[in-house]
């Protein structure tokens, strides 16, 4: 904590009692010093969910992801092993790949044409045979920890990190219970936004349904708020609620035991199992700075050829539901800097943990306090 002023120190028991809790102070959402601390103490040390395994199912498939200024490339080798590396050439630092797609059997740097095998080993460096003491072992790509877990791909920049299951104990089994088809999902749509909001602001918004009625009329028409619960499980939480058919959003057969499952994963991923069988949505957050977050909002179905009903649902997410949340977090980010905001807001957590209770935010802010404690 020596690099932070006392303004950024939180007591270890901050928000420990949700019914008496207030949010973290506003400057934690706006000050770059807080974000720099989070970069090293949250994002460089945590397992971050970055993709569904189906996006990297075949040999030579690759994707790139950027988080806290680091570009990471994930690639499936010809040996079918999925690996992650820092997306940087060890020669002079040029990035190797961009976007996603099919890699060739060697990755060639665009700058000086150094070539690397898909396992990260150097294949060839031009003129290296004429360079004294050239050591190919020191010219390999630098690996990033990677695990496939519950149908998804996670990375961790800490080489000494324990497993995803250690960070999120019990999550995998619960996701599989909520969506038995999770391993069969395929990406159907992606909405990418560079959102002018702090990553914690976006998580706060996700961790409560207090705003659902006023801000999400279509979604609220399908969720039964009186049969909606939010349970805490350490580094992940589960929002669970029974669903009802709605002409505004989710259409399914009346009388089925349909439900919503919303999983938040520390620090910044949200997995959503919808009432529609064989469907999930995922919000991947990739923080850029204290007031900017790159978000991928991905929609998955088990079938590749989409039905008209599925296409309509994608359009509803794109044109209605997603913009509703974006407007909320963008407005909050502006308001947090207002002279009229008192610096902290009362967390509306009720004693019953009802469907509109904000106790999930208190839980999240207590986890943040462990990062900012003295």
What are these language model-derived features?
Residues 43-47, 94, 211:
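Generic structural signal for secondary-structure transition and capping sites
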Residues 3, 76, 87, 147, ...:
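C-terminal catalytic domain of Rieske-type non-heme iron oxygenases
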Residues 24-67:
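Non-catalytic accessory segments flanking enzyme active sites
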Residues 55-159, 163-173:
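Rieske [2Fe-2S] iron-sulfur-binding domain
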Residues 45-56, 125-129, 264-269:
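Short Pro/Gly-enriched beta-strand edge/turn motifs at strand-loop
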Residues 6, 10-26:
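Short, contiguous pre-domain boundary segments
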């Amino acid at each position: 904590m020596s690099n932070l002023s006392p303004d950024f120190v939180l007591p270890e028991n901050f928000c420990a009692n949700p019914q008496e809790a207030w949010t973290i102070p506003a400057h934690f959402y706006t000050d770059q010093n807080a974000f720099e601390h989070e970069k090293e103490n949250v994002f460089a040390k945590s397992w971050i969910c970055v993709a569904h395994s189906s996006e990297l199912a075949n040999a030579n498939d690759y994707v790139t992801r950027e988080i806290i200024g680091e570009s990471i490339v994930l690639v499936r080798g010809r040996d079918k092993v999925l690996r992650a590396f820092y997306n940087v050439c060890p020669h002079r630092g040029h990035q190797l790949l961009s976007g996603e797609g099919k890699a060739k059997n060697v990755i060639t740097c665009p700058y000086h044409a150094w070539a690397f095998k898909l396992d990260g080993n150097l294949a060839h460096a031009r003129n290296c045979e004429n360079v004294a003491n050239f050591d190919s072992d020191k010219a390999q790509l630098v690996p990033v920890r990677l695990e496939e877990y519950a149908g998804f791909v996670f990375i961790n920049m800490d080489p000494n990190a324990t497993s995803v299951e250690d960070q999120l104990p019990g999550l995998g089994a619960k996701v599989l219970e909520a969506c038995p088809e999770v391993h069969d999902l395929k990406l159907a749509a992606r909405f990418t936004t560079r959102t002018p909001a702090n990553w914690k602001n976006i998580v706060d918004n996700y961790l409560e349904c207090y705003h659902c009625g006023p801000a999400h009329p279509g979604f609220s028409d399908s969720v039964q708020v009186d049969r909606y619960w939010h349970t805490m499980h350490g580094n992940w939480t589960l929002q669970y609620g029974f669903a009802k058919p709605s002409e505004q959003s989710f259409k399914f057969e009346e009388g089925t035991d349909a439900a919503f499952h919303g999983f938040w994963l520390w620090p910044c991923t949200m997995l959503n199992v919808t009432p529609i069988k064989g469907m999930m949505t995922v919000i991947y957050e990739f923080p850029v700075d204290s007031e900017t977050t790159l978000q991928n909002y991905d929609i998955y179905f088990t079938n590749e050829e989409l039905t008209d009903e599925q296409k309509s649902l994608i359009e509803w997410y794109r044109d209605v539901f997603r913009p509703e949340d974006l407007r909320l977090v963008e407005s909050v980010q502006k308001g947090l800097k207002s002279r009229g905001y008192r610096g902290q807001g009362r967390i509306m957590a009720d004693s019953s943990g009802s469907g509109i209770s904000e106790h999930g935010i208190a839980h999240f802010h207590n986890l943040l306090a462990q990062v900012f404690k003295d």
